[in-house]
């Protein structure tokens, strides 16, 4: 295991490893214990009580964070004709069809989200082995397979995030930057948590959210009490 930096060790010393913090308290502590000198990203991880190998226990969705992520997403749109022009006008970073499909088939994935018009999904679907593992495959359930490319691009640029449980039953997503006000971070966390709870599969038995953790990019993990869903602005 790599040796932790002194800054990391100092940050970890401020955290009670035996305690599960309220959301506001956790994000405040994450801000205070950021060991990096740059404006680090704050991420959340949930361990879910589901078996993602079973189709009826897959958790996948989207959430519009009320305060965005602090990151401007690079959006790729598979479209032609008027839809391509609309995507460009909406601010998409990459727009095309066969040219982009060929480039991605060669291994290029230098973008954060992908949108496709329904008529092109027959071709885009062949990119599953490249886009699927990176959670970049357009999907009707997340609003990224749609004729309304303008709305899709605006939503993603405005702070919409996609999430999907991985093979280890974990969900990961960004809730903002260290520079964000703690209340805004807590409100973003609450919005994401609410959507994850709404998507609980009926086949999931027992405790649904088994563990919740907040951490900065290179900072220590901070346990969050998943039973606290309201934004409490007092520790």
UniProtKB/Swiss-Prot annotation:
GO molecular function ontology, one term from the record: tRNA binding
Cysteine pairs bridged by disulfides in the record: none
Pfam families with a match to the protein in the record: Ribosomal_L1
Source taxon at top rank: Bacteria
Annotated GO CC locations: large ribosomal subunit
InterPro entries: Ribosom_uL1_bac-type, Ribosomal_uL1, Ribosomal_uL1-like, Ribosomal_uL1/biogenesis, Ribosomal_uL1_3-a/b-sand, Ribosomal_uL1_CS
UniProtKB keywords: Repressor, Ribonucleoprotein, Ribosomal protein, RNA-binding, rRNA-binding, Translation regulation, tRNA-binding
One biological process term in Gene Ontology: translation
Family to which this protein belongs: Belongs to the universal ribosomal protein uL1 family.
Known role: Binds directly to 23S rRNA. The L1 stalk is quite mobile in the ribosome, and is involved in E site tRNA release.
Record's subunit section: Part of the 50S ribosomal subunit.
PANTHER family registered for this protein in UniProt: 54S RIBOSOMAL PROTEIN L1, MITOCHONDRIAL, LARGE RIBOSOMAL SUBUNIT PROTEIN UL1M
Protein name: Large ribosomal subunit protein uL1
